[in-house]
Amino acid sequence: VLTPIVEEAVKPIAVWLGAGMITSPAQGFALGALCGAGFALFENLAAAATGGMDWTLVVTLRIGTAIMHIANTGLMGWALVGAWRERRFLRLALVYAWAMLVHGSWNFLALAYGMSSLPPALGMAAEELSFSAPYALPAIGLLTAIMFASLIVMNRRLRPSPYMQLVVETPEASRPDSRV
């Protein structure tokens, strides 16, 4: 329960520290996504180093986790800079709540799936969690797809349009007599 609360607040630490220097929410998203990628890298290396599973299986299963961390932290970076620059505090609160919900759901589903391989003699909690195990992998797949789609949508939304024209004010253009 505490893991999503702490991780989603701390992962974008570079955005927290540099929010005053970041000039746009798009830059906050990019920096946040990089923070999430770095976090996922270290978390996945730690998972692979614990042993007990084939390395390729660990990497394959952790791809979704990496996407979740990158997307959540990118969204948090976007919301943090939006709160700092544009005073959009409600957006920050909603994105933080969303990130905690996704992360908490992810952890629950992973736990349910993991419990399915344990013997039923471990008690009622293991049995109750293992009941949801058949739904855990499809639900994790759905969460991965949603988070990957959010990365694509935010990338398209925050990318400058190629049709935007850059208008540069020149001394000649600013004089009334220079217009044709």
What do these predicted regions represent?
Residues T3, K11-L166:
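Transmembrane helix-loop-helix hairpins at the membrane interface
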Residues Y163-V180:
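Long, low-complexity, intrinsically disordered cytosolic termini of multi-pass membrane proteins
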